[in-house]
């Protein structure tokens, strides 16, 4: 993918890594991706040609969500190590196929939950692990609502620079509509899944990490929400999901929109562009900890 994350990762590549190929189904984005490498990378519209190259050791998959599993499995089968953006996949079956492919072909696969790599996330984890807020019993995540398609537009011919069939890939074919891309694919269940699968993959990933719950899961899930009644986008607009965990007992809540806790340093908000629209509060039996955002930016409440 040659969108924001794709060429950002290419541009920030380590000095001991050569970006030899970039790929996107949109020729305009593809040109931008090539430019981000200083014109050194070879452009491709079809990722399968990238996987055929013997000089490619690893790939970064920053495509729409519905492509993640298929491209990860293909990369493993061709011996390429993988960094795949969150969310890792769209279904449990896809996730199992990805794990199986990585194990069978002895490939390293990393999922892009960038928030875990931030210094602030490390400090927040240590703060909780050292018992500074006591035993954590509840984590409440908040996020603004998913957009609704209140002004639908008719289907049309795809733009000349876009390979629409290849963009759809594993999805059922349908006519092109500008409400499908680029970033707005996230508001469709089959290709994005709404805010909970987009930003939730960041905020709740940190929660599972901090609570040492990566290799377990909830014993019950309760949800309520409001779904759209018009337009193409079908992800829930408002929603609240409550996950109950056992051994230890704790509750994880995802609320959109939820009760936002304003960031305490207003000057820093303006200076660094902190996005207050989504974050999490960790409630312990002695105190609480607020961790803002959860992906490229992670900030903890000063204590």
Model-based region annotation:
Residues 1-38, 115-118, 128, 207:
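N-terminal Rossmann-like dinucleotide-binding module
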Residues 41-46:
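Conserved SAM-binding strand-loop segment of SAM-dependent methyltransferases
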Residues 58-60:
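N-terminal Rossmann-like NAD(P) cofactor-binding module of classical short-chain dehydrogenase/reductase
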Residues 64-65, 69-117, 131:
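Beta-strand-loop-alpha-helix segment that lines the small-molecule cofactor/substrate pocket
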Residues 100-107, 123-137, 147, 155-159:
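Basic phosphate/pyrophosphate-binding loop/patch that engages nucleotide-derived ligands
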Residues 140-184:
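Core domains of carbohydrate- and sulfate-ester-processing enzymes
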Residues 165-249, 260:
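Rossmann-like dinucleotide-binding domain that binds NAD(P)(H)
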Residues 231, 244-303:
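NAD(P)-dinucleotide binding in Rossmann-like oxidoreductases
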